[in-house]
């Protein structure tokens, strides 16, 4: 009995440590395995004829639900979709799917954030500067650690694969796969979302920063209403986007979405870039497609080569972030050029302003973008 109790305490501690539903379910299964004989003895007589098989079936169903989606089509609002060279959907490589299952992105963040000093050498080897690590440490010390986990909780029953593994495989094994996140509209009391409801929806394209197209961001963008959010990625984890990527939004991604059945309002196409992904905003400003965007939004990234553009520009950053320090002056310069400019700037925030101020930023973007679905 003492041995069982010790094992159970260790398993409960492991259950509390893990963040993902997948590993929490496995810990519960192991606890059940330790006490299965005792549990069987506690069952009423009529239930003993079934044994404990129904409980194992229930655990297996829960485990299956906790695994990332492999189906191309699912009822989830947030999905990771693999695309072939023509922009048509395809199943993800099985190896990438299995690694997604066994090493969920949520657990990588959970271990990295909670054990930052242990993970620091690995993070540094990946090119993350000491300033960013120090800022993360400061946020943790200030009680903001939950901000890094809330987006995963916000995904709810949605359980897409992680977008970073396709990029890791491209870098490490020279594969050439491409995957995007699609976040479908939530709809409101006036318009119930469906692909065939007779409405066209705004499209918000998100370009990630360094270290890849994380699932974490989708738990934030899920709260944008009345729009389709498309999170595209660079082939590697660099987050450096070029004019070619801007062209592909119109020649590759939008046609792909429309073949999937999404109805897009081409007058309401918005582009957002985070950190290194701000390179997409600079590229768009100097692209012939600048006129095709309704707004450009740079998050935690000063813009280079400012110029007058025929669309709105939004700047989001923090005063403790060197990557955002120029935003107030840049907003002023753009306004003097005649560009409608929105500024969300918090002097005491750092490079992680998006996770720390996600609700305020979402409300700011809703106001600036004025996302509305229109009848076809």
Descriptions of predicted regions:
Residues 215-231:
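Short amphipathic alpha-helix adjacent to the substrate-entry channel of hydrolases
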Residues 198-209:
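Short beta-strand element of the alpha/beta-hydrolase
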Residues 12-15, 21-38, 42-198:
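A domain-start/cap signature at the N-terminus of enzymes
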Residues 193-199, 241-275:
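Gly/Ser-rich "nucleophile elbow"/oxyanion-hole loop immediately N-terminal to the catalytic nucleophile
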Residues 308-313, 337-339:
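Short, proline-enriched alpha-helix->beta-strand connector loops that line the catalytic pocket
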Residues 267-309:
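Primarily recognizes the serine-hydrolase "nucleophile elbow" in alpha/beta-hydrolase
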Residues 314-318:
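Short beta-strand/loop motif that positions the catalytic acidic residue
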Residues 24-31, 61-69, 112, 122, ...:
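C-terminal catalytic histidine-bearing segment of alpha/beta-hydrolase fold enzymes
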């Amino acid at each position: 009995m003492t041995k069982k109790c010790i094992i159970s305490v260790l398993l409960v501690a492991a259950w509390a440590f893990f963040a993902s539903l997948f590993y929490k379910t496995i810990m519960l299964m192991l606890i059940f395995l330790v006490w299965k004989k005792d549990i069987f003895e506690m069952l009423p007589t009529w239930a003993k004829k079934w044994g404990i098989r129904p409980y194992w079936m229930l655990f297996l169903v829960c485990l299956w639900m906790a695994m990332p989606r492999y189906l191309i089509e699912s009822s989830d609002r947030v999905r990771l979709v693999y695309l072939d060279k023509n922009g048509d959907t395809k199943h993800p490589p099985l190896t990438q799917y299995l690694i997604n299952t066994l090493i969920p992105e949520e657990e990588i963040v959970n271990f990295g954030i909670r054990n930052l000093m242990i993970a620091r050498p690995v993070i540094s080897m990946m090119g993350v500067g000491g300033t960013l690590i120090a800022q993360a440490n400061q946020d943790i010390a200030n009680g903001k650690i939950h901000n890094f986990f809330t987006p995963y909780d916000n995904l709810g029953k949605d359980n897409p694969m992680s977008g970073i593994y396709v990029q890791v495989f491209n870098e490490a094994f020279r594969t050439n796969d491409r995957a995007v996140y699609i976040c479908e509209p939530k709809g409101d009391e006036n318009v119930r979302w469906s692909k065939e409801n007779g409405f066209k929806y705004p499209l918000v394209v998100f370009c990630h920063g360094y270290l890849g197209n994380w699932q974490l961001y989708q738990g934030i963008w899920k709260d944008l209403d009345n729009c389709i959010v498309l999170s595209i990625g660079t082939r590697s984890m660099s987050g450096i986007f070029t004019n070619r990527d801007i062209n592909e939004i119109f020649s590759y991604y939008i046609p792909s979405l429309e073949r999937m059945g999404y109805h897009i309002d081409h007058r309401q196409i918005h582009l957002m870039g985070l950190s290194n992904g701000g390179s997409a905003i600079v590229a768009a400003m100097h692209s012939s497609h600048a006129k095709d965007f309704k707004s450009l939004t740079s998050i935690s990234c000063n813009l280079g080569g400012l110029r007058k553009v025929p669309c709105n520009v939004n700047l989001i950053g923090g005063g403790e972030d060197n990557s955002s320090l120029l935003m107030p002056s840049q907003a002023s310069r753009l306004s003097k050029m005649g560009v409608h400019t929105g500024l969300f700037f918090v002097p005491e925030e750092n490079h992680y302003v998006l996770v720390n101020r996600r609700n305020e930023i979402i409300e700011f973007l809703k106001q600036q973008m004025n996302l509305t679905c229109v009848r076809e």
